[in-house]
Amino acid sequence: GLTRPSKRCLAGSAPCEFHRGYTCCSGHCLIWVCA
């Protein structure tokens, strides 16, 4: 239940700023949760 990786991000940082509900996983923004 993941979308394709989006904007780059830092692991352990706040949720991705460009959209709510995104989480940082493996250096990329993923919707909702990590796989």
UniProtKB/Swiss-Prot annotation:
Lineage: Eukaryota, Metazoa, Spiralia, Lophotrochozoa, Mollusca
Disulfide bond sites: C9-C25, C16-C29, C24-C34
Primary localization: secreted
GO cellular component, one term: extracellular region
Name of the protein in question: Conotoxin Cal6.1d
Gene Ontology terms for molecular function: ion channel regulator activity; toxin activity
Protein purpose: Probable neurotoxin with unknown target. Possibly targets ion channels.
Locations listed in the record: Secreted
Tissue expression notes: Expressed by the venom duct.
Domain remark in the UniProt entry: The presence of a 'disulfide through disulfide knot' structurally defines this protein as a knottin. The cysteine framework is VI/VII (C-C-CC-C-C).
Homology family: Belongs to the conotoxin O1 superfamily.
Keywords of the record: Cleavage on pair of basic residues, Disulfide bond, Ion channel impairing toxin, Knottin, Neurotoxin, Secreted, Toxin
Proregion span(s): 1-8
